[in-house]
């Protein structure tokens, strides 16, 4: 049986792949700490936590139950349409970044718990964990506007 490596691997069949970072680990831009990607992630992955990056080295941590490429497409739409409700779009437009500057990679696949449970809640908990671990909150550290810890109650 061959080992399937963890990491980010573009499918090369969609337009979102041009912005995906192919990696097995990533380094925090301010602390220099290295983290390993948890799971094999492509733009077709579901139930994953992901990071968006920009040239300013600010990060946005998000989650999606849908295919990752669908969520990235929504971020790009928000940027193109100057959506003021999106912290990512506001930053990209105020900093005059282009869509080509957007980079993303998956951080972790959230699998169904072995003994059952609420996968959606676990996904939200893992997003909160990564927002905190990577210190991606606005205004100085990142592009996340809020981190809701009620998912742990």
Regions found by a protein language model. Give the residues of each.
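Charged structural interfaces that engage phosphate-rich ligands
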Residues: 1-153
């Amino acid at each position: 049986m061959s080992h399937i490596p963890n990491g980010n691997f573009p499918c090369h069949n969609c337009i979102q792949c041009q912005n995906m970072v192919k990696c097995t680990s990533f380094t925090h831009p301010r602390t220099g700490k290295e983290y390993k990607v948890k799971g094999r992630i492509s733009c077709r992955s579901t139930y994953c936590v992901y990071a968006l990056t920009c040239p300013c080295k600010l990060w946005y941590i998000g989650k999606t139950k849908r295919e990752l490429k669908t969520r990235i497409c929504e971020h790009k739409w928000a940027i193109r349409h100057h959506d003021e409700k999106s912290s990512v779009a506001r930053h990209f437009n105020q900093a005059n970044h282009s869509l080509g500057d957007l980079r993303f990679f998956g951080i972790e696949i959230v699998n169904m718990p072995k003994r059952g449970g609420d996968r959606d809640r676990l996904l939200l908990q893992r997003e909160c964990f990564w927002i905190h671990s990577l210190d991606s909150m606005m205004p100085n550290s990142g592009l996340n506007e809020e981190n809701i810890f009620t998912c742990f109650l």
